[in-house]
């Protein structure tokens, strides 16, 4: 869980901004969205394999 403590004389807006940044970096919201619906293991594997293929194609394009 993202834990943000207020610093000296820090406004609520800046603390909220730090909290939102930390939540984004930790991937908490994307994880929660992913877990809202059940995904069958074969579907999960397909999605991950497709992502790996996309990354490999992108790396190959960048290398040339």
Curated annotation (Swiss-Prot):
Keywords: Ribonucleoprotein, Ribosomal protein. GO terms for cellular component: ribonucleoprotein complex; ribosome. The keyword Phosphoprotein does not apply. Residues 43-64 have a biased composition (Basic residues). It comes from the Bacteria. The keyword Ribonucleoprotein applies. It holds the Pfam family Ribosomal_S21. GO terms for molecular function: structural constituent of ribosome. Gene3D superfamilies: Ribosomal protein S8. Residues 26-64 are annotated as: Disordered. Disulfide bonds: none annotated. InterPro entries: Ribosomal_bS21, Ribosomal_bS21_sf. One of its GO terms (biological process) is translation. Belongs to the bacterial ribosomal protein bS21 family. This is Small ribosomal subunit protein bS21. It comes from Dehalococcoides mccartyi (strain ATCC BAA-2100 / JCM 16839 / KCTC 5957 / BAV1). The gene is rpsU.
């Amino acid at each position: 869980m993202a834990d943000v403590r207020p610093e000296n004389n820090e406004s609520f807006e800046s603390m909220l901004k730090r909290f939102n940044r930390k939540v984004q970096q930790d991937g908490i919201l994307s994880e929660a969205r992913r877990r809202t619906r059940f995904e069958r293991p074969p579907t999960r594997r397909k999605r991950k394999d497709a992502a790996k293929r996309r990354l490999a194609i992108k790396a190959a394009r960048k290398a040339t």
